[in-house]
Amino acid sequence: MAVSLVKGGNVSLTKEAPTMNVAMVGLGWDARVTDGQGFDLDASVFAVGEDGKVLSDAHFIFFNNKTSPDGAVEHQGDNRTGEGDGDDEQVKIDLTKVSADIKKLVFAVTIYDAEARKQNFGMVSNSFMRVYNNDNGTEIARFDLSEDASTETAMVFGELYRHGAEWKFKAVGQGFAGGLAALASQHGVNI
């Protein structure tokens, strides 16, 4: 049975699934309120070093740069509607291939063109991040985000990070005003 996390909680993926080499991260959401304009939310990953910054712009993985330089992190593609149950976007991580310089994988979701469309995370519900074993589909951990991000246009859902020889998953749930530009700047990406 999957470990259910609350904001700030963490779990050792290495202990929960010792034989897992390839993890799949699923991120999901639903539009709660709409004025008729579609919602396009985009998942992205910042592969950061000890200083919390990406090693290079190529370590920002998203729908236009689907694979990290070491080949370990692969975005599975953009879902432009977010409709239906289950994962809206997925990222595959080969934990055995992640460069030793990468200390953390930060998983974020942003609302495309949020300012022009007057959209924010207060209009989004049922957001979640889950980690499961890609080999057998077993869900290891899940974080259902609370719905207290009323005006933010970007959100860090969670992180996979190294802790000694282990990989851990931390539930973050931190909103950001300023959308993708603010998140990218914080993590050292030039956009």
UniProtKB/Swiss-Prot annotation:
Role played: Not known; seems to contribute to the tellurium resistance (Ter) mechanism. Also involved in phage inhibition (Phi) and colicin resistance (PacB).
Keyword annotations from UniProtKB, A to Z: Plasmid, Tellurium resistance
Family label: Belongs to the CAPAB/TerDEXZ family.
Biological processes, Gene Ontology terms: response to tellurium ion
Residues making up the signal peptide according to the UniProt record: none
Domain of life assignment: Bacteria
InterPro entries: Stress/Tellurium_Resist, TerD
Entries under PANTHER family matching the protein: CAMP-BINDING PROTEIN 1-RELATED, GENERAL STRESS PROTEIN 16U
Gene: terE
Lineage of the species this protein comes from: Bacteria, Pseudomonadati, Pseudomonadota, Gammaproteobacteria, Enterobacterales
Any Pfam family: TerD
Protein name: Tellurium resistance protein TerE
Disulfide bonds: none
